[in-house]
Amino acid sequence: MVPATRISSQRLYNASLRNVPTLVSRDLDGDGIVEIPTQPDEAGLLNLSQSRRMDFIVWMDYTSSQPEKSFGLLDEETNCYIELPAEWEGNLKLTDSEEFDGAVELRTVDVDELVLTVRLARTSANSTGWTRLGVVASRQLQARMGPDVLLTDTNYRLSKALYLLN
């Protein structure tokens, strides 16, 4: 077992500052360890129209030698978290979708490549080509990967990426 690196209380306090009052520490993945949600500025860029309801979050386990536990997107309206591949951290921007009304797109910062589209749809909506993440606020939360996305993380599953935080 590798011992965890000590973190000062001031650094821990600064790292865990967040502007979403309902976002609290919790055992996100059920492993018995409480993870601390952080909102680092370098995690990704937000489009102004979406910045009031969505944010990039990194869940930290400061008892581990590798404290970054999970990276993803928090939807403040529905109080849910969508885990994203760690390899995307720091190279994403969140924008409104031009193709789908009310949907958001995650694009790479460097080449503006579409990596993921997320939408809330009626439960009766056509879901062909979409992965159903779950039901949130009586609607389906659906997502689909961009056409040219290749993941290096072979363990990542979009269908298992949704966490309800209520």
Spans of features found by a protein language model:
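Beta-propeller fold detector
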Residues: 3-12, 68-73
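Secretory pathway targeting signatures of secreted, lumenal, and periplasmic proteins
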Residues: 85-130
